[in-house]
Swiss-Prot record:
One example GO MF annotation: cysteine-type endopeptidase activity
Gene Ontology annotations of biological process type: apoptotic process; proteolysis
Name this protein carries in UniProt: Metacaspase-1A
Organism (species): Aspergillus terreus (strain NIH 2624 / FGSC A1156)
PANTHER family reported in the protein's UniProt record: METACASPASE-1 (PTHR48104:SF30), METACASPASE-4 (PTHR48104)
InterPro entries on file: Caspase-like_dom_sf, Metacaspase, Pept_C14_caspase
Keyword Transcription regulation (UniProt): no
Length: 403
């Protein structure tokens, strides 16, 4: 399959009855209290060995933890992984002092946006994408306390024009998802449909291409680029607000443009914050974090002067894409691979969302690295792709995965 920007497709293949959503919905009252929203008990002691990551090197104490070699046999004798710390955590790795991020405890409000596009009647029609988001929305509702009224589903089988996954509706819904979000909220974004690449205009992608998603009306309205998704859904978030994203599409490896990327082999990519701090790119951010507006103005002016000399595309527009919020993204394969789709139990299903649900159903209490390995094991039974986890901040992969 070729990979110019309009023909790299990932999607599903198995019919699904086009019945309205309402029919199979029982009455949804308040979700029963479940362990996901419980903060740790007041006298909870974090197990030893979970301190903040050492500054300087990678995050893993004494090399990668055992799950990297041994699938899910979690070595270390802790009954379960530690919950996320409640205090701000320094970015480290050469970032300026005071430049921190915060994990979300995911105890606050929950909102979800799920987009599934089968492209009915178009060239490159898919069959599994609407199914993917129906499965995911049911899973979120039944297991993670996302109320139906706090979820927006955009699928191209709906009669209501506002629920069609057009470019305008998708962008509007992305703004809705993050509006008024607070620390410890848990926002969820799922996209199943065609993805692809387009030549990168601002010089910020390693491979010279931006990742894009294709709304149902892309032939008229055009695609949506990763930079725009980052600007709408990541930039406005406060420290400690979680956004979890899952992409079932081709070329989705960097679809939210997050700078830290992890695989079952360890860290694949991290930004050089010391270098970027030296270029003044983090100066504005850290001054802002300290509330030091005077220095922020002078730093910003110096940075703009430097950028105006047009040192190169990198100097001009590269921001670190780090965020003090808690943004994570699960995607299949690497950017250079295509996302496979196949029949699962007679229905076409997006590989990533299916593996994510399957892995968490088997064991809801996993660390990030355990979950990466579990998802890899699920994918390996049916697919060629490997999972990766991208993050807006350095991630302690031994912490308990919460959502």
């Amino acid at each position: 399959m070729q990979h110019h920007h309009h023909s790299s497709y990932g999607g599903g293949g198995g019919g699904y009855p086009g019945q309205a959503y309402r029919q199979q919905q029982p009455y949804y009252g308040q979700p029963s209290p479940q362990p996901y929203a419980q903060p740790p008990p007041p006298n909870y002691q974090r197990p030893s060995g979970y301190g903040p990551p050492p500054s300087g090197g990678h995050m893993y104490q004494q090399g990668p933890p055992a799950p990297y070699q041994q699938h899910n046999s979690y070595q270390g004798g802790h009954g379960r992984p530690a919950p996320p710390p409640t205090d701000p955590v320094a970015f480290g790795h050469g970032a300026p002092q005071g430049y921190n991020f915060q994990y979300s405890r995911c105890t606050g409000k929950r909102k979800a946006l799920l987009i599934g596009i089968n492209y009915f009647g178009q060239k490159g029609q898919l069959r599994g994408c609407i199914n993917d988001v129906k499965n995911m929305s049911t899973y979120l509702n039944q297991n993670f306390g996302y109320a139906r009224e706090d979820m927006v589903l955009l699928t191209d089988d709906q009669q209501n024009p506002m629920s069609q996954p057009t470019k305008a509706n998708i962008l509007r819904a992305m703004h809705w998802l993050v509006k008024d979000a607070q620390p410890n909220d848990s926002l969820f974004f799922h996209y199943s449909g065609h993805g692809g690449q387009t030549p990168d205009l601002d010089g910020d992608e390693d491979d010279g291409y931006d990742e894009v998603i294709y709304p149902v009306d892309f032939r008229v309205a055009g695609h949506i680029v990763d930079d725009e998704m980052h600007r709408i859904m990541v930039n406005p978030l406060k420290p400690g607000t979680r956004l979890t994203a899952i992409f079932d599409s081709c070329h989705s490896g960097s679809a939210l443009d997050l700078p830290y990327i992890y695989s079952t082999q360890g860290i694949l990519k991290e930004p050089n914050l010391a270098k970027e701090a030296g270029q003044g790119l983090l100066g504005v951010v850290s001054a802002y974090a300290r509330g030091d507006m005077g220095s922020m103005v002078s730093t910003a002016v110096g940075f703009l002067k430097k950028a105006a000399k047009g040192d190169e595309a990198y100097e001009r527009t590269k921001q670190t894409k780090t965020s003090p919020a808690d943004v994570i993204m699960w995607s299949g394969s690497k950017d250079s691979q295509t996302s496979s789709d196949a029949q699962i139990q007679g229905q076409a299903t997006g590989a990533m969302s299916w593996a994510f649900i399957s892995a968490l159903r088997k064991n809801p209490q996993q660390s990030y690295v355990q979950l990466l390995n579990s998802i890899r094991d699920e994918l390996a039974t049916k697919y060629s792709q490997k999972p990766q986890l991208s993050c807006s901040h350095p991630l302690d992969v031994n912490l308990l995965y919460v959502m």
